Amino acid sequence: MLGIADMQPRQLAAQILNFALVLSTAFMMWKGLSVVSDSPSPIVVVLSGSMEPAFQRGDLLFLWNRGADTQVGEIVVYNVKGKDIPIVHRVVRRYGGGKTPLRLLTKGDNNLADDTELYAAGQSFLNRQEDVIGSVVGFIPFVGYVTILLSEHPWLKQVMLGLMGVMVVLQRE
């Protein structure tokens, strides 16, 4: 196996370009999913136990945001103004629709109260158009635990990126 120091400049450049190709392909796939699903974040990870037993911490959720109508009982992912962590909860009430903006009230299945305390200051309901990222259309159990581990232990990100970089550079064609 060749080390980095033993590689010819062209071979090293090819390996670096190969690594860049892998990263850009992943980015293009993410953006493609965003366009198809009409959601800025088409895949999210459940970060808490508020939706148990429907979803467990670490489940990977697939979102769809093409439907403008949301029904009571539907599970949606929304952002709260001023916070950057999406929340996954079930719609328990809906108001308006048609000519007036659709407003939603949500609640976690494992929570005692609705989400009004989680909403932005002065907000009693979610605006379907402005706050909701998408509706859950599918999930894969526990696959998202990698994301949780990476956010709880930041040094793991550096280790994983380093290992991926070494694997790409040392890969033989």
From Swiss-Prot:
Write down what this protein is called: Signal peptidase complex catalytic subunit sec11
Q: What is known of its domains?
A: The C-terminal short (CTS) helix is essential for catalytic activity. It may be accommodated as a transmembrane helix in the thinned membrane environment of the complex, similarly to the signal peptide in the complex substrates.
One GO cellular component assignment for this chain's record is: signal peptidase complex
What is known about what this protein does? Catalytic component of the signal peptidase complex (SPC) which catalyzes the cleavage of N-terminal signal sequences from nascent proteins as they are translocated into the lumen of the endoplasmic reticulum. Specifically cleaves N-terminal signal peptides that contain a hydrophobic alpha-helix (h-region) shorter than 18-20 amino acids.
Record field: transmembrane: 16-36
Question: Which residue ranges does the record annotate as region C-terminal short (CTS) helix?
Answer: 159-170
Please give the organism. Answer: Pyrenophora tritici-repentis (strain Pt-1C-BFP)
Domain of life assignment: Eukaryota
Supply the EC number(s).
Answer: 3.4.21.89
Residues on the membrane's Cytoplasmic side span 1-15
Say which enzyme class the record assigns: hydrolase
Q: How does it assemble?
A: Component of the signal peptidase complex (SPC) composed of a catalytic subunit SEC11 and three accessory subunits SPC1, SPC2 and SPC3. The complex induces a local thinning of the ER membrane which is used to measure the length of the signal peptide (SP) h-region of protein substrates. This ensures the selectivity of the complex towards h-regions shorter than 18-20 amino acids. SPC associates with the translocon complex.
Topological domain spans for side Lumenal: 37-173
MF (Gene Ontology)? serine-type endopeptidase activity
What InterPro entries does the database record attribute to this sequence?
Answer: LexA/Signal_pep-like_sf, Pept_S26A_signal_pept_1_Ser-AS, Peptidase_S24_S26A/B/C, Peptidase_S26, Peptidase_S26B
| Membrane topology reported for the UniProt record | Single-pass type II membrane protein
Question: What protein family does this chain belong to?
Answer: Belongs to the peptidase S26B family.
Q: Which reaction does it catalyse?
A: Cleavage of hydrophobic, N-terminal signal or leader sequences from secreted and periplasmic proteins
Its GO biological process annotations read: protein targeting to ER; signal peptide processing
Q: Which residues form the active site?
A: S50 (charge relay system), H89 (charge relay system), D115 (charge relay system)
Main localisation: endoplasmic reticulum
The UniProt keywords, alphabetically, are: Endoplasmic reticulum, Hydrolase, Membrane, Protease, Signal-anchor, Transmembrane, Transmembrane helix
Instruction: Give the subcellular location.
Output: Endoplasmic reticulum membrane
